[in-house]
Structures are given as C-alpha cells and as structure tokens.
Amino acid sequence: MKVLCTCLPGFGHFNPLVPVARALTRAGHEVAFATAESFCHRVRSAGFTAFPAGLSLSDQLEAARLAYPRLHALPPGTRRFEEFVPRMLAGVAAPARAGDLVPVVRQWKPDLMVHDEAELAAPVAAAIAGIPWASHSIVLLRPRAMVCRAGETLAALCRSWGVDLGPLGGLYRYLHLDACPPSLQAPGIDDIPVAHPIRNTEDSDTAEGDADLPSWVSELPHRPTVYVTLGTVFNRDPGRFRAILTGLGDEAVNVIATLGHGADPAGLGHQPDNVHLEGYVPLSLLLAHLDVMVTQGGTSILPALGRGLPLLVVPQGADQFHNAEACLHAGVGRRL
C-alpha cells in the first residue's frame, strides 16, 4: 500500500506523524510526505521521500495577514486561535497546498492519505482521487466551533474542485489517530466515532537529525534539572529566553535551554554556571535527565508527560493557550 502523509511545514506538525509513518514502513508499506518545499529537506533527512506542496509557515502567515487583517491583529490568546487560525489554515494554507497536492496525488497514486489535523488540503485531494484519509492529532482536539469555522471557510475550495466534504471539511470522516493522553484530551473526543487512541512508543524528534547528547549532561551536579524550550516557531525572541533564564539563574538547579536549530547561544550573553545553552538537542535524549520542563506548550508536552515530568507552560501563540489550560485542569502543570 502507498501512503501519502501531509503536514504543515514545521516540526510540531511533522514529528507527531513520524512514528506512524515509520510503523507503516516497517509493515512493508511505501510512505512519502508532502509539505512546503522549505521543509522538504527535514523530511528527507528523516529518511522519507518528500514532495513539495504549499507555502512556508512565514509565507502562510503573511498571506493570512493580508487576507484577514482584523483577525490577525488580535492579541495572542484563545480568541485569535479560534478565529484567525482556522481561516488561515482553510482560507489561505489549504488552497495554496491543494494546487500542488492534487497533481502529486494524481501522479504518485497513494492508496491512503494521513494528515496532521491542521493540514486541511489532504481531504480535498483524497476526495478528488477517491481514496480514504486519516487525520492525526497534534496535541489537543480542536474546539468544535473552530473546526466548523474551518469547514465553512474550506467550502469555497471544495466547490472549486467539485467535492463536498461537509461542515467539518472532511475531518474525522474515516479515521482520527489520537495520541493525546485521555486525562489531558478534550471531552469532545467522545463525539468522534472514528477516533482511535494511540500511544507513540517511538521517539519522534529523532526526525530532526542525528544529534548526540552533549557529554556534559551526564556530568551535571546531583540536583534538580530544569529544561527550557520555546519550541521551533516562537523561539526567535531572545528576550523571552532571557526572562526565563533570569528567573532560574539564582536557583539551586541545573538549567538546560535549547534555543532552536541554527541559534547561537552566544547571543544570550554570559550565563551563570548552572545554565547550559544549546542550539538543538533531541528531547528524547534529554528526557531521562530532566525533573521539570518549562515549555511554550506545543507538542513537547506529550513526551514530557509520558515521562511524568511536571510542566510550567508559558504559552506564546497558536494552540498553546488551550494546551496550557488543559495541563492546569489535569493537574500536570502550571501556567505562567
């Protein structure tokens, strides 16, 4: 069987699909990915075929800013996530991706498509080809009103391609793979008959390269170790890191902060001896050495919770405010 996976061009959307893609490969199926050209090299470095399709995250955001200026101007938070994001995904990202994705599907001829639940062009392309599709969770289930808003926005694209995906834009039609722990997941998951719970037992962030654990990690003093990450999208502002590190610098803890691919730790200046800065280290390699995680509230919360790490969530944008509230409600973390 040939399976085409699609995702937005970011690690937070690609990495959750990696364990499923690798499981399919081990089972003898042929797997490929379709994502923005700017991210294809990351997919290929993880060992998968990659087809370019759609806009980069920055181009997607800029196009959405021009298309929905009032909603784009909303401050980061729940309202912006529920009103601006679905229109960006369905009204900007999906049409741009569909124009590239439909020809890929016609040429490569997959038997099944698997897409991250924020990537909304896959159901359109799959429906045109007459094949089934499955969505894969990122973290929490999207609020129903948000999914309906995306479905309404996607309707114009569906009409232009001559398909009818219904009010939810094709989401949850055949199968939804839910990797979120039940204790954290939104109650709306019970209203999705095709939801199938899964637990990823394979480290997904190895998709980001063959990085090694720095030798100094195993030589840290015997005291609690705090890990700081702001993910791979909201990690561009050094001021955010400085504020967190300043608060931790005088504490009797080890601090490990990863700044992101290509980031220069020297940009944050001199740090106390207990603070260690790195550009990128796979979280899967660090988890066994950590006691607490300070996070923006993206996909990293799932492997952290799998290890039983308490969380301090500092949401920056997108779904992170929802995720922070869920962690607080479940008693697994605090929100700052």
Q: PLM features: residue spans?
A:
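Nucleotide-activated sugar donor-binding and catalytic core shared by glycosyltransferases
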Residues: 1-8, 19-32, 45-47, 143, ...
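A short, glycine/small-residue-rich beta-strand->loop->alpha-helix junction that serves as a flexible
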Residues: 5-18, 235-238
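Short internal beta-strands
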Residues: 30-36, 255-260
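Conserved nucleotide-sugar phosphate-binding/catalytic loop shared by glycosyltransferases and other
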Residues: 32-83
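A nucleotide-sugar donor-handling region in carbohydrate enzymes
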Residues: 36, 40, 152-225, 230-235, ...
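Conserved nucleotide-sugar donor-interacting segment of glycosyltransferase catalytic cores
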Residues: 59-63, 86-165
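Alpha-helix C-terminal capping/helix-to-coil transition sites in glycosyltransferase folds
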Residues: 107-109, 172, 288-289
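Donor-nucleotide binding loops and adjacent catalytic segments primarily
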Residues: 198-292, 300-301, 321
